[in-house]
C-alpha cells in the first residue's frame, strides 16, 4: 500500500516496514504505527540517537508490540558460513570488519553504513563490550576499536576513500 502518511496504514495492513535514507526519520514515522500496536520492521539504523531508541523500545515493550531492526548482511550465506567456521576456531582473539563508510554522509554519517559492521561484530562476539574508541583518519578512511570484557578485540575499518566490499577476518 502506498500512503501519504504512515498512520494511513493503520487498518490496511497487518505489519509495516519503515525505511528512510536517514535514520533520524525512522522513529517519527513509526510512532503512530507503534501506538496502533502494529508489528514493525525498522530499517537500519533503528534511530539516530540512543535515548530516542530506548524510549521507543520501552514503549513497544509496554504495548507488547514486536519491533525489529537489523542489517541484512548477517542473513547472507557467506556470513553464515563465516560464523560457523568461527565457532570451530575456539577462543577468538580478534575480529576485523571492513566495509564502506562515509562519516560525513548526508544520510546520517557513520550510522548509514557503519551499522552493518557493528551488527556483524555483535552477532559474532556479543554485547559484553568494555571500551570503544574511534580513530579519525586524515582523509576518508577511519577505524574503531571495540574491546570485550572477556578478551577479544574487534576492529572496524571504515573505508571512505575507495569502494570496499564488506568482509570479515578473525584469529
Could you say what each language-model-derived stretch is?
Residues 14-15, 94:
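Short, Asp-centered acidic motifs that coordinate Mg2+ and/or phosphate
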Residues 47-107, 117:
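A contiguous active-site-proximal alpha/beta segment in oxidoreductase catalytic domains
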Residues 15-21, 27-71:
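Beta-strand-loop-alpha-helix segment that lines the small-molecule cofactor/substrate pocket
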Residues 97-165:
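Rossmann-like dinucleotide-binding domain that binds NAD(P)(H)
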Residues 1, 165-171:
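Short, intrinsically disordered, charge-balanced linker/junction segments flanking boundaries
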Residues 4, 42, 71, 133-136:
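Short loop/edge segments at beta-strand edges and connector loops
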Residues 21-24, 46-47, 73-75, 137-139, ...:
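Short beta->alpha connector loops
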Residues 2-12:
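Short acidic low-complexity segments
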Amino acid at each position: 500500500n502506498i500512503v501519504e502518511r504512515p498512520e494511513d496504514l493503520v487498518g490496511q495492513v497487518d505489519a509495516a516496514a519503515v525505511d528512510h535514507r536517514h535514520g533520524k526519520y525512522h522513529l517519527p514515522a513509526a510512532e503512530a504505527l507503534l501506538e496502533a500496536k502494529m508489528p514493525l520492521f525498522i530499517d537500519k539504523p533503528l534511530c539516530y540517537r540512543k535515548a530516542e531508541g530506548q524510549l521507543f523500545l520501552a514503549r513497544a515493550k509496554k504495548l507488547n508490540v514486536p519491533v525489529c531492526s537489523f542489517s541484512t548482511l548477517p542473513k547472507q550465506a557467506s556470513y553464515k558460513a563465516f560464523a560457523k567456521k568461527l565457532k570451530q576456531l575456539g577462543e577468538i582473539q580478534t575480529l576485523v570488519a571492513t566495509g564502506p563508510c562515509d562519516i560525513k554522509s548526508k544520510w546520517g554519517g557513520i550510522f548509514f553504513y557503519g551499522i552493518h559492521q557493528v551488527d556483524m561484530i555483535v552477532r559474532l562476539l556479543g554485547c559484553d563490550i568494555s571500551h570503544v574508541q574511534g580513530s579519525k583518519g586524515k582523509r576518508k578512511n577511519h577505524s574503531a576499536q571495540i574491546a570485550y570484557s572477556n578478551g577479544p578485540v574487534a576492529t572496524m575499518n571504515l573505508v571512505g576513500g575507495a569502494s570496499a566490499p564488506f568482509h570479515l577476518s578473525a584469529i
